[in-house]
Design a protein with these regions (language model features):
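Generic structural signal for well-ordered beta-strand positions
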Residues: 92-93, 215
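Thiol/selenol-based redox catalytic cores and closely related redox-interacting motifs
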Residues: 164-224
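Short active-site neighborhood of thiol/selenol oxidoreductases, capturing the structured segment around
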Residues: 94-123
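Structural microenvironment flanking redox-active thiols in thiol-disulfide oxidoreductases
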Residues: 118-172
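Short loop/turn microsegments at loop-to-beta-strand junctions
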Residues: 79-80, 102, 202-204
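A short, polar/charged loop-to-alpha-helix boundary motif
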Residues: 223-238
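N-terminal targeting signals for export/organelle localization
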Residues: 2-78
Length: 243
């Protein structure tokens, strides 16, 4: 069932998340923090809504044509069951890994995207800080395992990269949309031939507890606006008592 849409996904914030969210609001980001689900006092309700009725959204192969029309999982919801190939090509049980340690889960388009490459580098800079807080860092893209390895080697990444070459994970998270026409040949190639529908994920960041519940998210259809490493670290720090 289609959820209510907004171009910028801002919703209710618990008081513990308010400070980090207040800063992030200026990035035209995406927040969902359902105080009712988390049983926390509601500090503020922040909305920037250009509501789109579900029956007006144009769809193809089960996903919207526009990134603004995605229907992502909300804070308080649980992540789906997922097994994805790692850079080595071996199957990685995401749910098992999340159950062992609180997780910062990042969806990016691919190593070919300059904005994604910059984001990956920023994540590497704070990876030790995040692990010191008790988190693990996992990033997922449309790249094939071979291309994930290239990204890891080129940028000297020490955290886990997973391949969502067929966009199955992005679809389950509700962040997949139809890629622009200029990507028609490019996307199947970088995915190892698996992205036959030429889809892309909206760049997203999720903070998860060990139960697999989403505690925080940043989702922005504007591919140039990524959650900075410093702000991610601040958000992660603010949630330490809840993980």
């Amino acid at each position: 069932m289609m959820k209510t849409k907004t171009q910028n996904y801002l919703s209710r914030l618990s008081w513990k998340n308010f400070l980090a969210a207040f800063i992030l609001i200026n990035l035209i980001g995406v927040f969902h923090s359902n105080a009712a689900v988390l049983n926390k006092p509601l500090a503020s309700t922040l909305t920037v809504s250009h509501a789109v009725k579900a029956d007006t959204i144009k769809m193809t192969v089960g996903v919207p044509l526009k990134p603004e029309d995605i229907s992502p999982l909300l804070v308080g919801e649980s992540i789906p069951v997922l097994n994805l190939p790692s850079a080595s090509g071996k199957s990685f049980d995401l749910n098992k890994s999340v159950a062992e340690k609180p997780t910062i889960l990042v969806f990016y388009r691919g190593g070919w995207c300059p904005f994604c490459s910059k984001q990956l580098a920023g994540l590497q800079e704070i990876e030790k800080d995040l692990t010191g807080m008790g988190y693990q860092l996992i990033a997922i893209s449309t790249d094939s395992p071979e291309n994930l390895t290239k990204s890891m080697d080129k940028q000297k990444l020490s955290y886990t990269l997973l391949s969502d070459a067929d966009l199955s994970a992005s679809k389950k998270f509700g962040i997949a949309f139809k890629g622009p026409k200029g990507y028609d040949k490019f996307l199947p190639e970088t995915s190892g031939g698996k992205n036959v529908d030429k889809l892309l994920p909206v760049p997203s960041v999720f903070i998860l507890n060990k139960k697999g519940n989403i505690l925080f998210e940043y989702i922005n259809p504007n591919i140039t606006q990524r959650l900075s490493a410093d702000l991610l670290k601040a958000a992660a720090s603010s949630l330490r008592k809840e993980i």
